[in-house]
């Protein structure tokens, strides 16, 4: 086992990364090894997808499968060995299918079949024991003694960034958004990473390419969400329980939320969002469901307590899931899509009757709690509508600075930095937030500036796209570069979606970003220095020192 993809990975003087019997996330060594083998097989599929494309062969089913299965290897997504093995076997099937199509096309065209790299040649074992025996060939640091640590760090930066992009591709696909060109570029990068490179410049360029690719993917996802559900609008949301039977929907998948709402109409069940599903409450399409009553709980890391206290059924539509046995609710949590946990019921297809039956059998909330409301829904359409007023207040001096504070949340004590930063921002500044990092301060009162709320909740982590659109619009109005705006970005990171959002921002030329609470363990000190020199990327220090620098720089 070797896994170093998330913020909570083991860090020791002897080396970084989880490499024992179990990762810090709870992932067993066998599961980690099977996930590495899955990635290896997916890279082999991409090798043939690239070659097949050169001869005009495009398989949309395979284009959709590869990022979806890759998504299963993200932090806190799928811990079920049987499901991981099934994805791996399917990858082997698709690779063979593409290989046959490619070779047939070569024969028809009268050209030679090209030699493929080792990553596309593995004959997959048929049992778990055989697959685990093959796993060392797929170990991410298998050649660590032969390559410079900076090269290893760049490889991992690319791999983990591409994982994040794969997740957003799958979210977009669920909403009907696919793009053959995007899929083709995705395969090219997967294929490239399947042949471990020692070219630092090429790896760095690839990392920026992944960022650019993800910008296109975020635009696809934004189009999918707004076409399906309308543009988010400023919305007041209750965060306290309502009396009655209940279902809690967590993750990111709004299509699943829609299906659950449709299937619970008239059944006397209240539906609550959780975590990154909170932004759904701002979409017009969901406001026609009166039994979508509000948001319950906070960010993913608190779920073992929050789900244990929730007296209804819980649905995990995507990341992040952690051990449901700790809170003794494994019999009433359900997984969807790429999510998996051993022994937890997985919902295939679009029938949520098992979830509904479980909710009806449980007690539900026995009384209403005193409401506490927050305001959400400031995605790019709402931000653009407010832009003239924002510009006027900037010109008058009423608004002097913008802060984007958000990203992933986590359970480390030093993440209190983000709470203190938000509370310490000047009264003449605006705070934009997104992702589950918002839960560090989104229930606090920040007031307004001439009717413009000081705290603007932009949405999910992928809604960094909305924040980018606002920054571009403001830069155009003020006829300046984005980096010349009175704008400071402070991103909390935990997993691979945050990595690819960072790569996206860097690829767009956004500079002077701060990340925290700790730097990725796979980034060497030298790589961190290069990123600081090239982009001004730096780690958070103290609220007082960082605020002083940010406000002075602006």
Swiss-Prot record:
NCBIfam families: hybrid_clust, PRK05290.1. The modification Cysteine persulfide is found at residue 408. Binds 1 [2Fe-2S] cluster. Binds 1 hybrid [4Fe-2O-2S] cluster. CDD domains: HCP. Hybrid [4Fe-2O-2S] cluster binds at residues 252, 276, 320, 408, 436, 461, 495, 497. This is Hydroxylamine reductase. Belongs to the HCP family. One of its GO terms (biological process) is response to hydrogen peroxide. It is found in: Cytoplasm. It comes from the Bacteria. Keywords: 2Fe-2S, Cytoplasm, Iron, Iron-sulfur, Metal-binding, Oxidoreductase. GO terms for molecular function: 2 iron, 2 sulfur cluster binding; hydroxylamine reductase activity; metal ion binding; peroxidase activity. [2Fe-2S] cluster binds at residues 3, 6, 18, 25. Its EC number is 1.7.99.1. Catalyzes the reduction of hydroxylamine to form NH(3) and H(2)O. Its cofactor is [2Fe-2S] cluster; hybrid [4Fe-2O-2S] cluster. GO terms for cellular component: cytoplasm. It catalyses: A + NH4(+) + H2O = hydroxylamine + AH2 + H(+). SUPFAM superfamilies: Prismane protein-like.
